[in-house]
Amino acid sequence: MRRILVVAAAFSVLGFTGAASAQPRQGVDVNVSIGPNLQKNAHDYGSRELTDISNDLKEAVQSAVAHSRAAPPVRVDLVIEDAVPNRPTFDQLGRTVGLSFRSVGLGGARVSGMATYADGSQRPIREQFYETDLTQERGATTWYDADRAFDRVAYDLGRGKFPAEFSGPGPTGGGHFGYPFNNQ
């Protein structure tokens, strides 16, 4: 019995030591801005929505880079060039009578930017994800596919991978829920 207690104590000490050495990195400066094309949709989506998705991208990148095994950048500047919601935003629901939150569409996002390293070198970042199959949208939240694009950016940065060109299909949905849509 005594031997079991000694072994258990040793494992607990080793476990705590391993956890202490796996502390996340600090100090990565992540800046996210909204591109001019997406700013044009601010009146339709709502400015709160754009603030929320930029915060989502920032948090995803900070988390991935902090836990990265690759040499992390010291600064990441990102631009959300385009984002299309899967479901109506709060502003769209408030503006259109009869519009349901159950309405669903094809969403996604396009992100570009630059990662700067401690030695001054810079690497461009270009990533996009747009869903093309409506059957994949069951249970999707408002910005589900945009979040998938943000997760791809974060994953690539965490692994030190930088797609030089946009890949995959472009936007297939407009993100404009309700009829008629007034573009003014």
Residue ranges and their predicted role:
Residues 49-82:
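N-terminal, post-signal-peptide region of Sec/Tat-exported proteins
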Residues 82, 140-184:
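Amphipathic, soluble alpha/beta structural segments
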Residues 26, 70-72, 123:
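Short loop/turn segments at connectors of secondary-structure elements within structured domains
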Residues 71-73, 77-119, 133-137:
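Surface-exposed short loop/turn segments
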Residues 47, 62, 95-99:
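Short structured motifs
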Residues 38-49, 121-160:
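Short secondary-structure boundary motifs at beta->alpha junctions and helix caps
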Residues 2, 8, 17-56, 86, ...:
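A structural "domain/chain start" motif
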